[in-house]
């Protein structure tokens, strides 16, 4: 009998894919991670990025099981757990210093850096753009084989594939015809670095954690981050998926885009001077840091609430590939890390069950029912959180969003 070393692939090197690779490595299980992007440089990973608050039962549990708890703790501190809620007139309606349960904030880049540095470099294949994923039965062995076709690399065959390739997942096409759908909102992202020294008044406005100014179905939200930064999200509610084209924002810098946002009566023309100053400064600073670059403004997508697929042997999805949702429940990365945690346990359990001497077909027979249960559990909790997130989106991006968000926090 051949010695078992199941051929496991993880498609996607985001938080869920990297965490799954690290969790399997901790258990002595080999998996290859294929990632579209080139390996990020230290300079790129040091840049300000969105902040992620990790929850005890999911993100924090994954950090502990990855053996990264101390390193994770050392990477915190850029953003506090404090919250400020303002209305468009600039009136503060709610402040707090975080809930009873700690939910520490880490930047997306810091989390990525932590996972990359603790995963053996030979397990991650960078610059691998996937063309297609196929499934077929090997008539000789009886095992299901998953074939991955790349644009510029040799085709590879695996016994099990976890699709962690995000919103526009190629892997998902093998399992589900459902494409992401437009959520009804557009997002502009801009960053102010060294805010405390360069713009102390804006630093005070935003506080040390998260600030949300909401109303008239739009929002300005900020998070503090690396390099004493303020990361601004200008969120515009519109049924027009092609809004950036409709209003002529394509191929414009953030400094140019700000005029549309600040001059429109339906957007931010009548907001408080301090909030308009925040938006203008963030757009100007973004263009100063990235001269000539197009503004980062785009539609926000989600998978249909309750998205699921018929189970197939040898392949599954995790993270945004499985359950892309809007960010209004703060659960996206936490669910992704929870998926990685549970799937790693399932793969390890199948490994223990069949022992060292088994072929791929026997391993898949042991694994398959466990993956079915994993998928049912994952999709059930994801559906609940996706529904919550979509409900919050409609609540917070309403005419009186600030009042409704303040009430939400006061009742938590």
Regions found by a protein language model. Give the residues of each.
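Eukaryotic N-terminal low-complexity, Ser/Thr- and Lys/Arg-rich leader segments
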Residues: 1-8, 19-28, 121, 138-150, ...
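Conserved N-terminal helical subregion
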Residues: 2-8, 23-25, 49-195, 243
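A structural signal for isolated positions on well-ordered beta-strands in alpha/beta enzyme cores
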Residues: 9, 32, 231-233
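Conserved mid-domain beta->alpha element of the FAD-binding
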Residues: 9-30, 37, 162-163, 188, ...
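A short beta-to-alpha transition loop/helix N-cap that caps and shapes the active-site region
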Residues: 40-44
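Short, solvent-exposed loop/turn segments at secondary-structure boundaries
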Residues: 46-47, 175-176, 246, 329-332
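Conserved FAD/dinucleotide-binding core of flavoprotein oxidoreductases
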Residues: 94-97, 102, 107, 112, ...
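Histidine-centered metal-chelating micro-motifs
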Residues: 168-169, 189, 218-221, 322-323
């Amino acid at each position: 009998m051949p010695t078992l070393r199941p051929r496991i692939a993880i498609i996607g090197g985001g938080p869920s894919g990297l965490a799954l690779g690290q969790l399997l490595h901790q258990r002595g299980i080999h998996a290859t991670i294929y990632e579209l992007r080139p390996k990020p440089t230290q300079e790129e990973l040091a840049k300000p990025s969105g902040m992620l608050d990790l929850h005890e039962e999911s993100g924090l549990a994954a950090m502990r099981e990855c053996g990264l708890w101390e390193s994770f703790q050392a990477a915190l501190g850029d953003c506090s757990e404090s919250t400020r809620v303002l209305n468009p007139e600039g009136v503060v309606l709610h402040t707090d210093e975080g809930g009873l349960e700690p939910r520490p904030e880490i930047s997306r880049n810091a989390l990525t850096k932590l996972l990359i540095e603790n995963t053996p470099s030979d397990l991650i294949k960078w610059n691998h753009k996937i063309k297609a994923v196929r499934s077929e039965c090997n008539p000789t062995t009886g095992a299901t084989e998953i074939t991955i076709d790349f644009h510029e690399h040799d085709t590879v065959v695996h016994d099990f594939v976890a699709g962690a390739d995000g919103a526009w997942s190629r892997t998902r096409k093998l399992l589900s015809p459902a494409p992401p759908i437009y959520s009804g909102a557009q997002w502009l992202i801009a960053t102010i670095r060294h805010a405390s020294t360069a713009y102390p008044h804006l630093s005070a406005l935003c506080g040390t954690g998260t600030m949300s100014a909401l109303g008239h179905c739009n929002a300005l939200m900020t998070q503090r981050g690396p390099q004493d930064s303020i990361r601004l999200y200008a969120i515009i509610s519109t049924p027009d998926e092609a809004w950036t084209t409709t209003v002529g924002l394509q191929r414009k810098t953030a400094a140019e885009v700000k005029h549309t946002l600040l001059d429109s009566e339906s957007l931010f023309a009548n907001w408080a001077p301090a909030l308009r100053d925040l938006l203008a400064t963030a757009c100007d600073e973004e263009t100063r840091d990235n001269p000539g670059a197009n503004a980062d403004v785009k539609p926000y997508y989600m998978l249909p609430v309750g998205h699921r697929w018929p189970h197939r042997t040898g392949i599954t999805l995790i993270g945004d590939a499985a359950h892309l949702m809007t960010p209004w429940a703060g659960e996206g990365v936490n669910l992704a890390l929870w998926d990685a945690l549970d799937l790693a346990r399932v793969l390890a359990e199948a490994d223990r069950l069949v022992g060292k001497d088994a072929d791929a077909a026997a391993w898949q027979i042991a694994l398959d029912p466990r993956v079915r249960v994993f998928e049912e559990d994952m999709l059930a909790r994801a559906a609940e959180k996706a529904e919550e997130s979509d409900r919050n989106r409609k609540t917070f991006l309403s005419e009186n969003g600030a009042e409704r968000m303040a009430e939400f926090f006061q009742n938590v």
